Amino acid sequence: MTIAEEFATRNFSIYGQWTGVVCILLCFALGIANLFHVSLLIIFSALCLVSSFLIIFIEIPLLLRICPTSSTFDTFMRRFTTNYMRAAIYMGMAIVQWLSIIIAASSLIAAAVLLTIAAGFYALAGLKGQGFVGSKTLGGQGVAQMIL
């Protein structure tokens, strides 16, 4: 199944997963870019950077098999196999980035917006009763089942 065919299924968990991949890149870039502020914004940029690494392991299940991680971390990551749990963690990460506005308006708002959109896609998938479907391109079919 190609990416175009995956999008044609109209499964919101696929949309959420691909939005999550974009979140990885955006959170990583903005986390590094905002580390150079001389204010409390550094805390939020560090949290954005940490979020990018969490999202990598959430959205690309093959990495849990490849990278040496502790059993505690693996257990924590396996909690996010349903649409509702993924929506919850994305919304949690989005709220943290929205709170960065308290310190100063910065480019971290873009990360907050995209994380909120990803949470929305996963929440819609849950509300519509769509089961979580992992993208084949990201190792979702077959490989993901070996990990779980």
Curated annotation (Swiss-Prot):
The chain crosses the membrane at residues 12-32, 38-58, 82-104, 108-127. It is found in: Golgi apparatus membrane. InterPro entries: TVP18/Ca-channel_flower. Keywords: Glycoprotein, Golgi apparatus, Membrane, Transmembrane, Transmembrane helix. Its main location: Golgi. Glycans are attached at residue 11. GO terms for biological process: vesicle-mediated transport. This is Golgi apparatus membrane protein tvp18. The lineage of its organism: Eukaryota, Fungi, Dikarya, Ascomycota, Pezizomycotina.
